[in-house]
Design a protein with these regions (language model features):
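Alpha-helical transmembrane segments and their lipid-water interface positions
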Residues: 37-43, 52, 68-75, 105-109, ...
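Intrinsically disordered, low-complexity non-transmembrane regions of multi-pass membrane transporters
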Residues: 1-9, 154, 183-190, 219-223, ...
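Membrane-interface helix termini and inter-helical loops of multi-pass transporters
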Residues: 2-6, 53-62, 179-196, 291-302, ...
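Membrane-interface junctions of multi-pass transporters
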Residues: 28-35, 46-93, 217-225, 232-306, ...
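Structural signature of hydrophobic alpha-helical transmembrane segments
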Residues: 3-18, 59-76, 119-134, 194-205, ...
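Hydrophobic alpha-helical transmembrane segments in multi-pass integral membrane proteins
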Residues: 54, 107-114, 166-175, 236-248, ...
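Membrane-interface alpha-helices at helix entry/exit sites of multi-pass transporters
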Residues: 147-168, 185-189, 266-270, 330-336, ...
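Transmembrane alpha-helices that form the ion-translocation and gating core
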Residues: 28-31, 88-147, 211-212, 297-390
């Protein structure tokens, strides 16, 4: 019998355990009325290395292609929420609110970390990382809640803005921090040129992908759309990995391009949903299994400072900006809660920092991994409660949410 067979089989068993745990978690979520996203995360954590050790870390890494594909499809759907006719009237509001929320978050996190660590480079980089909001978590909780209204609409736009600004600002600040340290190995302008090329390439790839999907949806029979969307998504993911492009930006742009160039976008999304639902379960179960309770403790004082300062920045910044702009009371009270969840983008950037700058990057990674345990468990609950209290969840859905199916 081949030696690789037991490992391959065990990976499949691990996936089965994750899915069964998620099934039980989803049923429990209906009973206790918590978002299914939280249930899948907790189910993954329970069977993962942090608690029961039913799944080891090596097998979790084998599922990375599934989780990236799930994130890609979620971002494609998020981009499809922004047809220009709908985006124009809300963009001015969202930009003002985004500037207020992100400025407050960056300032509070940077100042707090600087005071407690005395390390300005760590402070500004954590300030940039604090801007990122988990797109998959936020979008899927809003989708599960079937919420509609100003809080939901603004949260969707701000999630996209937060992640774009977080990626760009982190790369720029990381570059400046390295330049000011004694470890400078490349020129500022060459690195800036590389960053510009990466961002431009990601946007161009996303535009091409969105146009391709939209054009060929008009030529192909509907029953072939799912294969076509998956083929393009996987191809785009592969190209992003090959060329080291930020794939989240590519798929967001692809969605925006698709919804503004093709009348088939809503039907394409409904076809995509046939497999996206399963991939989303895998995504959150795997990320739950990756959550390390020990990292939460290892993050220590700086982790607690980061969590407190980021939470205050998101909540107070959104509230102050909404007040200054004269937004409705519901937006002032609840928008900040919808921006607290944090996972994929922040983890990816912190991992990149650890690879490029082992000393400081390792500290950033420890703090982010520890804080993600808090934000990914608390975030979805706050999002659902916020849209519910804002009156944006249909009454019938709010009443029947705890029905076991």
């Amino acid at each position: 019998m081949p030696e690789s067979l037991p490992n391959e089989l065990h990976s499949a068993v691990s996936l089965g355990i994750l899915l069964l745990a998620s099934l039980v978690g989803g049923i429990a979520a209906d009973v206790v009325r918590i978002p299914k996203v939280t249930a899948y995360l907790l189910a993954g954590m329970l069977v993962g290395p942090s608690v029961l050790h039913a799944i080891n870390h090596e097998h979790i890494q084998n599922f990375e292609p599934f989780t990236k594909l799930a994130m890609a499809l979620v971002l494609l759907e998020l981009g499809c929420r922004f047809p220009l006719a709908r985006l124009r009237p809300i963009l001015k509001r969202a930009l003002w609110l985004g500037v207020g929320e992100m400025s407050a978050t960056f300032a509070l996190v940077t100042l707090a970390i600087w005071l407690f660590s005395g390390n300005p480079a760590m402070a500004v980089l954590l300030g940039a990382l604090a801007l990122a909001t988990a797109p998959a978590t936020t979008v899927l909780v809003l989708k599960e809640s079937r919420s509609e209204g100003p809080v939901t609409e603004l949260a969707s736009v701000l999630v996209a803005l937060n992640n774009i600004v977080a990626i760009v600002s982190f790369e720029l600040l990381f570059l400046v921090a390295r330049m000011l340290s004694d470890e400078t190995v490349v020129s500022f302008w060459s690195q800036l040129g590389r960053l510009t090329a990466d961002l431009g390439g990601a946007c161009l790839l996303g535009m091409c992908g969105g146009l391709f999907i939209g054009y060929f949806s008009g030529l192909l029979n509907r029953r072939r759309w799912l294969v076509m969307v998956l083929a393009v998504a996987i191809l785009m993911l592969g190209l992003c990995e090959t060329w080291h492009l930020p794939y989240m930006l590519s798929f967001l742009i692809a969605g925006v391009m698709l919804v503004n160039t093709s009348e088939s976008a809503p039907d394409l999304l409904s076809e995509q949903e046939k497999i996206a639902g399963l991939l989303v379960v895998v995504f959150f179960a795997v990320h739950g299994a990756e959550l390390q309770l020990s990292a939460f403790l290892t993050a220590g004082l700086l982790g607690g400072v980061y969590i407190t300062a980021r939470s205050a920045g998101k909540l107070l910044g959104a509230n102050w900006a909404a007040r200054a702009r004269g937004e409705p009371a519901n937006v002032r009270r609840y928008l900040g809660n919808c921006l607290l969840a944090q996972a994929g983008a922040a983890i990816a950037l912190a991992t990149l920092a650890a690879e490029r700058w082992p000393g400081l990057g390792d500290q950033l990674q420890t703090i982010i991994l520890g804080s993600v345990v808090f934000f990914e468990i608390i975030g979805p609950v706050l999002i659902r409660q916020s849209v519910l209290q804002a009156g944006e969840v249909p009454l019938a859905h709010a009443i029947t949410h705890n029905t076991v199916t």
